[in-house]
Amino acid sequence: ENSIIIHESIFDTLLEELKKTGGYLVTGEDRAKLKAAMWPDGRQLSGKIVCKSVKVITEEAGISVPEGTKFLMVLGEHIGPEDMFSAEKLSPVVTLWKYKDFDRAVQMVIDITGFSGYGHSCGIHSVNEEHILELATKCKVSRMMVRQPQSVGNSGDWENGMPFTMSLGCGSWGGNSTTENIHVKHFMNVTWVSYPIPADIPDADKIFAPHFAKYGK
């Protein structure tokens, strides 16, 4: 997970649970050191950090963490270039964000994906179908995992119907040709054999009736 947006009512509780599973909250001067190690020039993520362990990352940053730490956490301060922790990190470093109402949470997802790169993915841990649909329709993401871990669910699982892949399409949002998980189908050549058929021409007045009713023809 790259960022976790948490309702204020459970923020402290979830933070403690994350610590129990091996998370360590990096704050103060250590947060600044970690940021400098991850983005030495202030914008480009360092190759020394990508896909590296907590041990390698903390040594590079010159900070100490408890033995057994599995991932690092930081509190999000701003979304955008003024706080690169809102960007994609490609490492066991997760940014925690707090929200009060769901509309704000949706906007935060929109802003984070907009800064990190539209078209990739997001997730939601909820049983509220209205919230699930709202997030899916408002965010420019190609995948949305519902009550699932992102890293495992996005790339395919027997229990979620997503095709197995190591390459995630991001659609035109991300400069790709498809929003699908790239798999064997996309490497197969298909020949379309077309025969003449009776014409079935759609009625434009019916198709655009709501638009014409609202704006005129």
Predicted regions and their residues:
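Conserved C-terminal structural/oligomerization subdomain of aldehyde/semialdehyde dehydrogenase
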Residues: 63-217
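ALDH superfamily catalytic-core signature
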Residues: 1-80
